[in-house]
């Protein structure tokens, strides 16, 4: 039996996948802004490995990833999150992407924070026809001389 996908070229499939991947990251942004852990849970593999800017060196599994976001949400009354310059390289069932991202908002104590721009890398897997984040890494540049992260750069 022939399906519509049988007639798609590889280029067409990659273009469709890139649209799906961008929508997926848009859902991450929406979930963060809404502080919706249930929505975020649907966007990651159960065995996600996350290298985030705060300790420990890695967060392994969806529970650890969500616990990390829950800690952030406890600090913020309202969350703003933006992604810039998102780029993907797409295969049939694996893709990777990179972008700049910034978390900002109003803290529970009423103070506002402009946040800091970070570099983010996504490792994506297509499982049962759905793209999921299997790995993410968030980082800031390091000033070698001082040994401190540089957090005042902008894209």
Task: Give residue ranges: language-model regions.
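C-terminal-biased regions
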Residues: 2-10, 16, 75, 98, ...
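Short beta-strand segments enriched in hydrophobic/aromatic residues
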Residues: 44, 101-103, 137-140
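Short, low-complexity N-terminal intrinsically disordered segments enriched in polar/charged residues
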Residues: 1-47, 88, 150-155
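Hydrophobic pocket/interface hotspot
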Residues: 28, 40-41, 48, 61, ...
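Surface-exposed, charged secondary-structure patches
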Residues: 20, 49, 64-109
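Short beta-strand edge/turn micro-motifs at domain boundaries
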Residues: 1-3, 117-148
């Amino acid at each position: 039996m022939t399906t519509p996908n049988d007639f798609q070229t590889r280029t067409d499939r990659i273009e469709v996948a890139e649209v799906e991947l961008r929508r997926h990251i848009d859902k991450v942004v929406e979930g963060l802004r809404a502080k919706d852990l249930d929505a975020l849970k649907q966007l990651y593999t159960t065995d996600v490995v996350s290298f985030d800017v705060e300790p420990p060196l890695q967060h392994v599994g969806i529970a650890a990833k969500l616990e990390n976001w829950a800690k952030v949400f406890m600090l913020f009354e309202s969350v703003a999150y933006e992604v810039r310059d998102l780029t993907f390289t797409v295969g049939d069932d694996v893709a990777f992407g990179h972008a700049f991202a910034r978390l900002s908002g109003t803290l529970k104590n009423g103070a506002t924070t402009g946040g800091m721009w970070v570099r983010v890398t996504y490792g994506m897997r297509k499982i049962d026809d759905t793209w999921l984040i299997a790995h993410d890494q968030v980082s800031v540049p390091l000033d070698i001389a001082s040994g401190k992260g540089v957090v005042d750069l902008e894209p």
